[in-house]
UniProtKB/Swiss-Prot annotation:
Transcriptional repressor. May modulate BMP and TGF-beta signal transduction, through its interaction with SMAD proteins. Its main location: nucleus. Ubiquitously present in many human cell lines of different embryological derivation. Residues 92-130, 210-237, 488-533 are annotated as: Disordered. This is Zinc finger protein 8. The gene is ZNF8. InterPro entries: KRAB, KRAB_dom_sf, Znf_C2H2_sf, Znf_C2H2_type.
Amino acid sequence: MDPEDEGVAGVMSVGPPAARLQEPVTFRDVAVDFTQEEWGQLDPTQRILYRDVMLETFGHLLSIGPELPKPEVISQLEQGTELWVAERGTTQGCHPAWEPRSESQASRKEEGLPEEEPSHVTGREGFPTDAPYPTTLGKDRECQSQSLALKEQNNLKQLEFGLKEAPVQDQGYKTLRLRENCVLSSSPNPFPEISRGEYLYTYDSQITDSEHNSSLVSQQTGSPGKQPGENSDCHRDSSQAIPITELTKSQVQDKPYKCTDCGKSFNHNAHLTVHKRIHTGERPYMCKECGKAFSQNSSLVQHERIHTGDKPYKCAECGKSFCHSTHLTVHRRIHTGEKPYECQDCGRAFNQNSSLGRHKRTHTGEKPYTCSVCGKSFSRTTCLFLHLRTHTEERPYECNHCGKGFRHSSSLAQHQRKHAGEKPFECRQRLIFEQTPALTKHEWTEALGCDPPLSQDERTHRSDRPFKCNQCGKCFIQSSHLIRHQITHTREEQPHGRSRRREQSSSRNSHLVQHQHPNSRKSSAGGAKAGQPESRALALFDIQKIMQEKNPVHVIGVEEPSVGASMLFDIREST
């Protein structure tokens, strides 16, 4: 015998002693089974409602009868796991822990009890009209002339629950009504009759109207000559079904479920249960692939899409798919051009809040990510991760051909060009190079016979100052700094007022003529050399002499002034 058959809430039909028959009510009689398709059509609110009704029903069975073994479905509902059953065939299926309804009807036929007929629903969207309604709680029992009473051994009252879901009327609101099955006690001191006309559930709280209940009790007990278990009372149905949302508005505002740790309140007990996992650190939902745990089942479902590659959210514009709806929402802003996050300092807008947060650090100069090894700070985590590889010597990017590792993906891409034979950098002599530094060095060697000058970073970190001013003795790292400094010494020698502006314009015109007639550089340069003031020639000679001493390869000869020398004179004139 099934374990659930052993622990049943026995219900005895009340009537003449000779006609007293025993009719056991098991958890299967009042349970609900869903197919996977039907379960998928329920929204989260309906699933929570289903969970609460099932747990409450099982609790009532425990309270009115002997101790029952906990079914598997109850354990799953208590843990909050997703629940559905296999697809139904030609006959109505059920949860593996429950017996098929057809077997239950056969057993009733053998005992001589009237067979049950499944309840039908018409006009239900999403379900066939000729199929049994999938979310009807319990068997749709017709009240017989015999009334129900307790088991003789206990000589107490028993309650039979036959919850039936009423058709949806307005805006998809559901109403659960308790069929008014009459309950009697066969003891000498009968227990007060109980009948709940409107038995509505909101997520975790049972809402009852005390005035309505008391009126129902008075209606049943008001006729002294009538037995409360007769058909006239049993066939009376509740017709005042009220939408759940109308009864729970006060609960939504009150938020009766409060967290004892942080004081945050919630509308529903299920939300409070999930919130408490933040304080306890409980993560009951674990991924079978990687072992990562989550506090909510919905988070686990989203995580599992990483392993399965399922991307149900597809962009209608470009067809790109995403595993999360939030990712699709952010992606759509690329097509619409929407940038809702605007910087209050500069007015620049972004399509993601995280991008705005990174941008704000450019104004504040904040660098919250600090290296624990050397103490260097960074404004982004990606920069910190790249920096940490210099300490750990981690090289995650490995070449498939030779096995050489690199710290950056760009370095790996450049390295792979060697194996592919790709050389994208080409000089004038049609020579090909893999990287730009090699091309630059080649061009300097071919043109000037020397290595290229130091880069900006290399010049900044130089310890020596090779360029010295002959007039004041001040030294500089770069020759351009010395040239700018020499101009400050010769400013007093420059003409002032209108004559200075005229000479500036004439120098610019001469530079323009030289640019337009490159073939006449030599003659014009020679003329410029002959017509230049003596102070200018001396200043140029001093600068060339200094550069010749420090770096003789990079100095252009004075005897044949080039366009650069003419530009130098023009700069001095303009300042």
